[in-house]
Amino acid sequence: MSSKRRNKNNKNNNKNNNKNNDNNNNIEQQDDIEDISSGDIDTTNLIIDEIEDVYDDYDNEQIKNSLNHSFSNKNNTSLNNSINLSMSLIEVEETELDISSTIRPWELNIFGSLGSSGGGISSTPISQLSPFKTPSPPSSSSSSSQSPLRKPRPSFLDSFRSQFNITNINNKNNNNNNNTTSNFNTSNILNTSNFRNTNIGINNSANNNRNISRNSLPVTFSQITPIKPKNNKQIDSQSQIKPQSQSQSQSQTQSQIQEVQFSQSESQSQTQTQSQNEEKIGFRLPSPLSPIKNIESEQKKASTTSMSYESIEKSQELQNQTQINKSKQDLTNISQKINITTSQHDKDDLGEYRMSEKGGGDDGDDDDDYDNQDEKDNNYNKTNKKQQQQHHHKGKEESQSEYYEKEKEKEKEDIATTRATTTTKSTDNSNNNINKNKEFNENDLQPWLLDALLTQTAPDYPIIQIIKHYDRKEDINMDGIRRKEYQDGSSFLVSDGVNFMIAILPTSVARDLIVSEGTRKIYHEMVGFIIEVQRYVLFPNSKYSGFELFIGNAKFIDKTNEPINFHNLKGVISSSTKLKEVIKRMSHENYWTASSPTEYSNKFFPQNVSNSHHYQITQHETIISQDQLDSLNNLSDWEKHEQPNKLYQFNIYKTNFRHKNKLKQQQQQQEQQEKENQQQQQQKQQQQQQEEQLKEQQEEQQQNQQEEEKQQPSQRQSQQNQQSQQNQQSQQNQQSQQTQQVSQKHQHSQGSQQNQQSQLLQKHQQSQGSQQRQQSQEKQQSQEKQQSQEKQQSQEKHQSQEKHQSQQSQEKQQSQKKQQSQQSQASQQKYQQSQGSQEKQQSQEKQQQQQQQISSQQKGLPKINDDEEYDDTILESFENYSQSQSDLSQQFLSQSQSQSQSQSQRQSKKRKEREENQDSENLDDTVDMNYNQIPSTLDHSTLQGHKFSMYDNTSYYSNQEQEEREIERRRRELAGEDSDEEFEILDEDQVGIGLTHDNDNDNDDEENSYTPTGAATISFLDQNIISGNSGVDESKIPKVFNKNNFDTIKEEEDDEEEKEQQNNNNNINSNSKNNNVNNKLNSQEYDDTFKDTAWIPKKSGKDKFDQSSSSTNFYSSNKKNVPQPTKSVNKPRSTALKKGASQNRQKQSEQQQQQPQQQPQLPQQQQQQQQQQQLRQQQNENTISSLNASRPITKSAPLKYIKRDLTFEEIVKRNKLIRKSREEKMEMWKQHNNIIDD
């Protein structure tokens, strides 16, 4: 074979080149032996003795089958990749490799890493590599030379020559030491691979990992030793196991050790120069012609004649035999401990990597595979040892003598002894790292967590036990602790024997504990650790829902199989209610920490948070005395629960309610904003859709136009004819609509004429009533004269006649009410019928309008704009309101009729009683109503809450006129007529007595309201309240602007002018009316109620009388008779009233003397009529007096009704209403046009 020939040529060249250096090599060998026997060498190079071709019987197919067999149960992509790397790097030319099923993934990764530049191993010195740091990856420049074609086989051996020391042991010794393993340091090889265990068998590596160099020397990789740093402080002198024979041979082998060191330095320099040259060239150089040991062996062969060398060998043989026998026994005991040290180094190297990923994990499945592989290795070694022996003997016969073999065996035995001493040192170091306390008891674990949190004091050097590895998904973000301390840390559950809580261990602390105990796994094997805590901090978590413990430094004590008192453990906070109250008070602005030592928490938290001085509070200091409680209760802030000062803003008892309310408000605002945004988006979408539709319509129109242009002229003429016909039809339709509109207008005009006629009738009736009143007044004056003379005679007659007349009047009233009710029902039916006909007409008109609009849009005709038709569409809603109002009026009328009958009977009884008590001569207490004669002696304090005006019924009308006006008002209400034509409601600014609020302030508060003690007169509204009728002010109800109202606005203005003329005519006789007031105020009850009321206005600026607010037409004719307020003079009220009464008597007597002279004597028939009228007047006076007596005192005073014109303010109001109606019409019309346009 070609490889054998090459190896033989290389051997011959080595022999010729190295004859001159025999003497030097002998000295170096002696130094090597001394160094090896002493065991003080730290690092040794690989010594390659022999390489033989042992791989002739194996093929590539067997290699693949063995690989598939060994890794059939694993589906790991990284492992398959490593296999491919190893196959690419191991070149097979003529000889075939046999990689059996015992190959492990880390071994393949080793080969893959060796393929890099410089032998594949990092060039950093081993002394600088710490056991807890992985070396840096290879440089990018070196990766360019990793092609397998440019990597001959010798480079693999050269790389081992620079880093490892591989020696041979005889097959006999190897058979006894199948189970021994070497301590393999993987810190030099961890470039890209992640693996756990690197135990390589002494004999397994010789059979599994085989490579062929150019020289055909057989090699067996018996042992691979770890390279240790020079300064190894962990090795103790007591733990080193040295044989007895070793101490004797130290003095003899010192010279030999020096020679070995010198040879080693030369070999290292050679390998370094070779690797540098390889990097420069870009591919691997061939290996040296012969290894170092071959040179030495050939030099020894030439110097066999010297006796000094033979004497040294004999002494070494005797010493080594004794050492080997003892070392064999020690190796078997130590082999088990070697695994522990290798696992420690692995975990030291991989600890940071695993903690940074997920805080540790379980890799227990790999251990079973490793054990199965060890059994396969042992079985395979037995079969391959025979092959090694055969090839070894062939090499002896061909190239070496028996003497040379003996020398090599002795040297290798010496190296084995040195290996045994180094392994014992490493195992002793591992035992020293396990700081177990055999005297530890379970009673030593005492509870301390709860007391420390409640007292805020941390004890020194407490003991805890790890219960569980607490995998928190969320980040550990605590207040105060720096990220460097906890970002790579992990959390555990820790107990003190009674309570448990969360503890945070940095990676450095957890790694030290794992190394000290010697476990093979990272975090999950820490369950059961008993630790003495040396530095720690107790603090609240980021959510302030519990406490946590940060451990800065700890010491391993012991480990138990199960946690102590595991089933009875409780959480710290759940075990005590006091601690719950403490954590509730904590927040980001208020918290505290406790640490041991006390200054240790200042590293993470501010000083004001930690109790570094150990201040403690006693029970006496927490007691509050009664004096202090009283002083606190007396404070306004304490009682009112006001906010404290800014200094105490962040106190302990502050709650987060405000913060929650703010959050709710923010959420609500966000929701509103989202809704608004959604609405805006919807509007935008609608607008876009509309725009798209318009665009489509425009496009369609354009297309239609284009099509029309393309049409023939004949078709165009036909279309024009059709359009002309359509135009004619539309004109006919318009004419028909115009005729309908004219008819509708005619109907409207007829309806307005009917309304005018009804109003004229009402006015005629009113004028007749006014004439009758004038006649009745003249008759009254004549009758009063006769009554003064014939009272005594006529009293008895009057009483009898009054009874008959009262019955007749009641019958007449009932008949009138029936007639009025029938008339009202008939008018309502007519009104409903007219409305129904109008609605039908409106619906027909709408349909016609729609048809016209459609035709106008199609033909491009002008739009129709009819004001009258539009008015009909607007007023439909108002008509519905008027119908509801008419229903309400019917209900009120039915109630008033039922109640008036019951009350009329009661009033008739009261009249009889009061007529007996009447005295016509008691005129002393009468009071004139003119303000000029009212005394000004009343105090201003009695006038608070009252308002006065110069418009009062009593000042201008007699009681008889008031009664007649009220009766007419009732009749008109029952008949459904408008009561606002003759009687107008005064505004609240003009009403005199008993209003509840001022003009400026419209607030109806109870403080500003005033209830009068009495009333001088009773209005019609009060009588309705007493009689059961509705107290609703129909004038205050908003007027419905029906179609008739719009048409009759101008007619109402004409009616107002007629009213003004009537008022002027009626006000001519005002003087005579005022003179007759005293004759009508004869009852004592009326006088009593009149005295209690105040009649003088206030002197404030609000209540001054302005003539501008009065009716202008009335005072234009009677400016002389306008009453004016007099200045107040301090006089007693009683004397002033008497003087006023005496003056009134004098005026009445003078008027009575003048009247009979002017009036002629009337016939008897007229006298009878006058007597009947007087009786009626007396009855009316009796009813008023009875009502005054039974009138309840109400908070809201009555409104006064007087005969007058519209004031300026009322005119403004009516104009505003008209403007509003017009504006509404315009808005509706705009909307109507927009709808048509769309």
UniProtKB/Swiss-Prot annotation:
Biased composition (Basic residues): 383-394
Membrane-spanning segments: none
Superkingdom classification of source: Eukaryota
Cellular component terms (Gene Ontology): CAF-1 complex; nucleus
BP-aspect Gene Ontology terms: nucleosome assembly
Biased composition, class Low complexity, residue ranges: 10-26, 129-149, 234-276, 417-435, 678-691, 712-792, 806-859, 882-906, 1062-1083, 1108-1121, 1142-1181
Biased composition (Basic and acidic residues): 344-361, 395-416, 793-805, 966-975
Comp. bias intervals (Polar residues): 317-343, 929-944, 1123-1133, 1182-1191
Chain residue ranges for the region called Disordered: 1-38, 122-156, 229-439, 660-1016, 1051-1083, 1098-1191
Biased composition (Acidic residues): 362-372, 916-927, 976-990
Name under which the protein is recorded: Uncharacterized protein DDB_G0290301
